[in-house]
């Protein structure tokens, strides 16, 4: 068999093995989710819940939403890991990486008169060892001038168990409605620039 043909077969075999491995890994995740009976939780997390010792995923989520809705930067800092591996990707700040970025981003939101309030709902929680991730939706309002406007965001948050407490490592948020996205960005950014 010519060398070129052997190389093609080897490349094809490697590609198939890689594809099969990916399918198996995805199947394991899907099977694990099915085994956990993952159904969306519709009862919202508002931040008014009992925080307890922050050893449970829902407590860590409640801590974040309490910090956000009460404009508590110290609590935001406590909720996020103190690690340069922290990453945030959302409609206000783009992709931000580093231990100080949650503080910087949320400080801008909190200084804004847009007065954003949200709750987390229609979510699932998934856990693998020292990591859990929550995937769901945020709904709430923000102020634009004199009136309140609705806010709907697809959201995911990843936490890592560090010294017995869940610390947020990653947040991603997306606003599907392009008009709403533009209005929200303008309200928060213009208000934040006026307050500086």
How should each PLM-predicted stretch be described?
Residues 3-18:
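Bacterial N-terminal signal peptides that target proteins for export
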Residues 21-32:
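C-terminal segment of classical bacterial N-terminal signal peptides
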Residues 32-79, 100, 187-196:
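Short, low-complexity N-terminal intrinsically disordered segments enriched in polar/charged residues
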Residues 34-39, 133, 152-182:
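Short beta-strand edge/turn micro-motifs at domain boundaries
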Residues 51, 55, 73-128:
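A solvent-exposed, acidic/Ser-Thr-rich amphipathic alpha-helical stretch
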Residues 106, 120-125, 138-140, 154-160, ...:
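Hydrophobic/aromatic beta-strand elements that line small-molecule binding cavities or substrate pockets
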Residues 113-115, 140-150:
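Short, cysteine-centered beta-strand-loop-beta hairpins and adjacent loop/turn segments enriched
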Residues 130-140:
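A short hydrophobic beta-strand element
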């Amino acid at each position: 068999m010519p060398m070129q043909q052997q190389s093609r077969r080897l490349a094809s075999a490697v590609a198939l093995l890689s594809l099969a491995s990916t399918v198996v890994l995805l199947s394991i995740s899907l099977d694990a989710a099915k085994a956990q009976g993952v159904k969306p939780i519709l009862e919202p997390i508002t931040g008014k819940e009992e925080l307890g010792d922050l050893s449970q995923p829902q407590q860590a989520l409640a801590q974040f939403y309490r910090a956000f809705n009460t404009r508590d930067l110290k609590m935001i800092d406590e909720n996020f890991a103190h690690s340069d591996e922290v990453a945030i990707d959302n409609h206000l700040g783009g992709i931000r990486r580093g231990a100080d970025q949650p503080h910087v981003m949320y400080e801008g939101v909190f200084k804004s008169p847009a007065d954003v309030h949200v709750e987390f709902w229609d979510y699932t929680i998934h856990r693998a060892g020292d990591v859990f991730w929550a995937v769901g939706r945020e709904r709430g309002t923000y102020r634009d001038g004199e009136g309140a406007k609705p806010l709907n965001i697809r959201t995911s948050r990843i936490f890592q168990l560090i010294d017995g407490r869940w610390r947020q490592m990653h947040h991603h948020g997306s606003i599907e409605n392009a008009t709403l996205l533009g209005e929200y960005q303008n309200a928060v950014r213009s208000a934040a620039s006026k307050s500086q």
